[in-house]
């Protein structure tokens, strides 16, 4: 058969192929920022990049040592990980989050983003189902719905949702991008709503140890969910707290029935955290000192950038937790992005996180002390 026959359908994955998955998805947001990044890189003193919240400080030595000590692991690791890892996760949840949970109800994941993106599909959601997430939100919540053919629904209040159609409800506290923290009363209301409608509630808590003017609470805390985790999952990451974005070290915890279902699915898909990273994760979660040290770094950078931005004319809203300042000049976000790029400063436009953010920018304080100091100088009028 001639391979040049124009009557043949395109190969799967080629342009024009039926059901090409990427056609469902929006343009990858960071690609739109590239022209502004090039402008900022042209500054004589170089780029001050506050756009992506990626760690820049060293991986703590004890974590590096744990990783190195487990590099001679030629065999396949397990999806669930060793009991020591799951006990470390459960111990951290109890010690730091006040959650009573056993090792049978936790599951390591290959970073938190892959879980967010693939969770709806792994739980069998599809056409006719709704995945709900906050109006200002991490874009991957929407992507996760689109990947499995479900309908993404952005909400401002739970009363806007049709509980008969929503199958998965995302919470995010502290919020990316706004840094807003949901109080225990708000979390309880969400849990009650989800349970009343038999909706799985998944709380993205990746910034929970980074509260500044507020003390974030986990959805798994007894004051929020009572004595049961039924219908609840919490997602946690070591990327920010331990500078492990390069390790892809995260986990999900909560309803043991749902965790077991995810385990069975992920075993078939081979979604496995490498054994050295599993060992490093267990050590990282058992140590609080390196987290306190990193918090001090972020607190200094946050204070310096906040003061400089406010002096420049920005208003900061929320931002009581997480690694971001949610800033506005009360004008379109891309105008602000362009203005700051001329100063060699790159920030994320607020509309990356939904139309409600179109007059804000997100400023990540994850750059080095030297780059933060450089930006502070450039913002002086």
Across the structure, where does each feature detected by a protein language model lie?
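Short beta-strand to alpha-helix junction loop
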Residues: 80-81
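A short acidic, glycine-rich active-site loop
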Residues: 73-76
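PLP-dependent class I/II
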Residues: 2-27, 40-69, 84, 94-381
């Amino acid at each position: 058969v001639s391979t040049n026959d124009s009557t043949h359908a395109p190969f799967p994955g080629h342009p024009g192929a039926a059901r090409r998955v990427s056609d469902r998805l929006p343009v990858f947001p960071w690609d739109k920022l590239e022209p502004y990044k090039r402008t900022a890189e042209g500054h004589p003193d170089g780029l001050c990049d506050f756009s992506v919240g990626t760690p820049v400080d060293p991986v703590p030595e004890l974590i590096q040592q744990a990783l190195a000590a487990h590099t001679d692991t030629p065999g396949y690791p397990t999806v669930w990980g060793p009991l020591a890892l799951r006990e470390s996760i459960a111990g951290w949840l109890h010690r730091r989050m006040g959650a009573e949970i056993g090792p049978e109800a936790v599951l390591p994941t290959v970073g938190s983003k892959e879980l967010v993106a693939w969770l709806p599909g792994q739980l069998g959601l599809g056409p006719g189902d709704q995945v709900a997430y906050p109006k200002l939100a991490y874009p991957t919540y929407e992507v996760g719905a689109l990947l499995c053919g479900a309908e993404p629904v952005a909400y401002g209040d739970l009363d806007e949702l049709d509980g008969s159609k929503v199958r998965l409800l995302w919470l995010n506290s502290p919020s990316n991008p706004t840094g807003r923290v949901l109080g225990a009363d708000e979390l309880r209301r969400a849990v009650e709503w989800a349970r009343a409608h038999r909706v799985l509630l998944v709380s993205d808590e990746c910034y929970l140890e980074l509260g500044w003017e507020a003390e974030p609470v986990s959805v798994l805390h007894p004051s929020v969910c009572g004595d049961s985790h039924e219908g609840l999952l919490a997602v946690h990451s070591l990327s920010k707290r331990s500078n492990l974005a390069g390790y892809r070290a995260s986990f999900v915890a909560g309803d043991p029935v749902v965790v077991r279902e995810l385990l069975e699915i992920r075993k078939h898909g081979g979604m496995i955290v490498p054994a050295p990273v599993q060992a490093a994760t267990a050590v990282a979660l058992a140590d609080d000192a390196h987290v306190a040290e990193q918090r001090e770094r972020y607190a200094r950078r946050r204070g310096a950038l906040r003061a400089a931005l406010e002096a420049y004319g920005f208003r900061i809203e929320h931002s009581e937790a997480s690694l971001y300042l949610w800033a506005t000049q009360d004008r379109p976000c891309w105008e602000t992005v362009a203005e700051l790029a001329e100063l060699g400063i790159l920030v994320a436009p607020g509309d990356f996180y939904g139309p409600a953010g179109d007059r804000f920018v997100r400023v990540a304080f994850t750059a080095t002390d030297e780059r933060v100091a450089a930006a502070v100088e450039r913002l002086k009028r």
